Amino acid sequence: MGFHGCLSTDEYEPELIEKYGNPEPPSSSILINTRPVNPFLSTFVYVGKASSSEDVSISTGEEEMRTLLVASAVKDAKGWVYLSGKDVEEIKQKIKNLQGLLGVSIKKLAVEAKIREAAKNLMVAQAKEKKGKHKQSTIEHYEQCSRRVRELSSKIWLIERKLAEFYMHLLKHMVAVCIAELKPGSCSKVSSPVSAITADESATGFRDEEIMNNEEIEQLVERMSRILEIAQSMGNSIREPSVLDAVQMNAGERLLEQVRHLELILKQIYEKKLEEDADAKDIAPRAIVNFWRLLTELFRGDNDTPEKSNALPDDELDKHLKSDFDIESFCFLLHHLLSLYQTQKKELASSNELLASVRDENTKKLKELQDIIEEQSKHMARLHREGFSEAAENNDKPKETMPCTYDSSLADDHSDTSNLSKDKANTLCAQCSVYLSEKYQQQQSLLQLESNIQQLENEKKAAKLIEKDLLSQISHVKLQFEQQIKAHHYAKDQVRNLNDEMVALRAELEVVKAMNSQPDDPDSDYAIKQNNALQNRLEALTRENELLQSRVTTLEMEKEVQEKNSATVSNLTLKQLQMENIFASLNLENSFDFGMPLMGPYTQQNLQLEDEISEISSPSYSSDDDRKTISETQPAPKQNINEEFENSTSTDGSETNKNEQGNSLSTPDNEPRLRKESLSSDVLLDGSEKPAQAELTINSENFPVDCSLPVQTGADVVVPDTTDEEVITSEPVKLEQPINENSNVEEAEKDYQPSEKDDKSLIGGILSTVEMTQSTDVNDEIENTLTIPVEVEHSDNIDKGSEENDLGKEAVDEANNNQNDVLESVVVEQSTTTDDCENKVYEGQMNDKNSSLDMVNACEGINQTAIGFVEKPDKVTELIDEAEENIDISQDISMTETNAVDDEVQAENSILQDEVEETRQDDIEKDELEDIKEVKEDENLTTLEETIEIPANDIEVQDPEQCSCMNSTENDNITTENSSEIVQVIHTEDDSLHFDDNVSTDSVSLGNKSRISMDSMRNDCEAFLPKKEKFGSLRTLHSFESSMRRVSTSAA
């Protein structure tokens, strides 16, 4: 224990701390200057006070010092127990088992360390490849391997600690065997009180032990050497560096590592024989080696007669008299302990010799005394014989003589003495018998006491067993009690639940009884409630039927409107073709040019003026507020005319038309030519390379613009002469056109039936060839100003343009006369279609209205184009062919749309019939369950079926023509922004109304749009659909029907 604890300053045994305080390792100077004391050398002799005064050659202080050292050594070994052979074998078996477990654990640790190293290398490789990022699975695998390594390392550390404890038990046993050699008999001649105390302490536990012979000592030394080898092998068990890194070294582990380090150094000293070359760091292991060597020499008995030597100097003794404990002091104390053992062994031998001599003398004296006793006994026997012989002689003498009296007195004396001796012998025998009987009784009582003690011990053991049994029974009963409590609580909960269920069932039974006991009185509360519920459901179904019928009529009206729109588009197309034929027949000096080749010298000019011409098709506003409101209400951003024309050609599905319209067509000078890029291209007045920048803007409400060229119709066109870099300025001219509201209304409604795709294609074709213009005959209600400011760089271009305008006056007069007739019919058709849109709330009709406005603007723009852009002719014949093809395609599409509307109406009617049949079947099942109310339910069902099967003709719908006539005054103020808002509102209110959302609103021209109030449009919508706002959408109708079903089931 002391040997194990003196190697480290971090952790110590508690016994050492109590005995020696806080130990510190010896300094290097102490280790260098301290010489281990060898009692077997010829120069060292320990002399105690038991020797004669002549042999004392040391001072009294040195003797006391050595006796104190010996006493401390014996005190240090006091707690070491002398084990029996059985205990030693058990300890050896445990050590063997732990060594096997240690070997297996070390092998596992080596394998786990290699696995951890491989996982670490994999993680590093992944981190290098992915620049610091690695997979989560690799990290988890490395952590798992590290955890296993730590667990095995801690397990190995615990096993080695247990092995060290068993090794220390064996070492303590061996030191106790050494101390057992000090017999108590040898301490009687020691006069020193310290040595007497030492002898008493050492003899307490080893009174019956005998002196060990040489064979036992040799066996003890061999066992010590084997334990030392095992301790050395413990230091070499772990060699894996990764394992040492994984273990976190605490105080106990550091202590074990220091022990291993010392053992490794000790092994190196044994193998390489470095005792002479050791420096100050290796002196402590060298002292351990010297200590073990001295022990082996002592137990082998090589030096039996050591001689006296001079005492150690006082300074060396003082070094060992410190309160701290170290390995050197421990060795020094054990040296003195062994010297005391040797001296007392010698004194014991001398005392034995003296005892033998005294025994011989005593035997001789005893023999002499026995001889004297035998002689005295013989003498007494002879005296007795002589006395008896004299008495017999006296009896033989005659009686007359006097000696007879003498003889009688002698006989009496002799009888008295014999009687006295017999009495004494009897008393002694009696006393002996009494003593023997008492001794026997004491022995019997002792045996009885021992048996009683054994019985009490057995009873105590039995009581302990009974107590354990009772405790186990108590715990078992307690567990059963807890289980019973749980079962009781569970049963209570079950009973409570059953009670609740019973109460609920009773309540239901009472309800059923009350329902069964209801009288047939029709005036009862139950019958009244049921009738009210059926009436409410009947009303709901009636309202639903009315809504569905109104929707059917709405779809039919939409179908009629589409047919009218398609007819109107066809009429407009024919009129357009007529106008184009008129322009083609004009014989002018300079032919018309509506576009330039795609890859000709004017391509750069086309690209420069695309944005400027797109501004023509989009409106300009008098203020920022107007611009903001209309831009917010538009459903999609305004596309340029090139994109519109591409969309129109793509919707028609003909790639050939697109290619023909997109490419330039070379024709003779007398034939006009139409191109897709005509609007977006620039028109030069003189054909030079550098074009004149022209801006075309539409200003409403007479917005004044500087540098503007006035545009007029007919013969009113005047182009003033200008010089170089001079800007033409003039006031904008208002263009008016009267609208005939009363004439041709019915005719326009019949003819105006445009389709969606025809509108797109035809409007795109017209807009690609003409500019925006206004006629002088437009009514005051539609007032817009069209100004075309032109920045002129070359005066030659201006002069040439003025000449071309003068040449085209005659053709324009003739075109205006034809155009006024077209505008009158188109504007009337516009008002009628607007009235239909307000009443029927259909988004496609609003788009058709916008498209018709674009057509009007396009036709009016023909005059402006004829005045301002007259350069080359185009192919009108190709445009006519394309228009005819588009008309055919639009008719096919309109037929498909009408068929789709019919299919949708049929599907809605079939869904309605299915729902009515489902409700009818549910009511029949519920009526079968109610036997009492069977007759009343049948009557209600019959009335319900009659109300559900309401014909569509019974529902009154307001005539759309009347609506259009009533709202004609208000329709003059309608704008497309309000119409788009209304269409959006209708979509949000009823998702089931599938309007045609494919109608493009991008081609709507806002130049001639007027404004209306939102309130008039909303009133018209409410008048047209009065009940749709109440019930919302078809989805809400379905939810209302399901709720009515639940009400009927609850009432049943």
UniProtKB/Swiss-Prot annotation:
Entry-linked Pfam families: Uds1
Residues annotated with Phosphoserine modification: S51, S52, S53, S57, S59
Coiled-coil residue spans: none
Phosphothreonine: residues bearing it: T60
Highest taxon of the lineage: Eukaryota
Record keywords: Cell cycle, Cell division, Cytoplasm, Phosphoprotein
GO annotation terms (biological process): mitotic division septum assembly
Bias (Polar residues) ranges: 631-669
One GO cellular component term: cytosol
Location of region: Disordered: 616-687, 726-760, 788-820
Listed Basic and acidic residues bias regions: 670-679, 750-760, 791-812
Protein localization: Cytoplasm; Cell tip
UniProt key word Lyase: no
InterPro entries per UniProt: Uds1
Reported induction: Expression is increased between late G2 and G1/S.
Role according to the record: Involved in septation.
The protein, known as: Up-regulated during septation protein 1
Provenance organism: Schizosaccharomyces pombe (strain 972 / ATCC 24843) (Fission yeast)
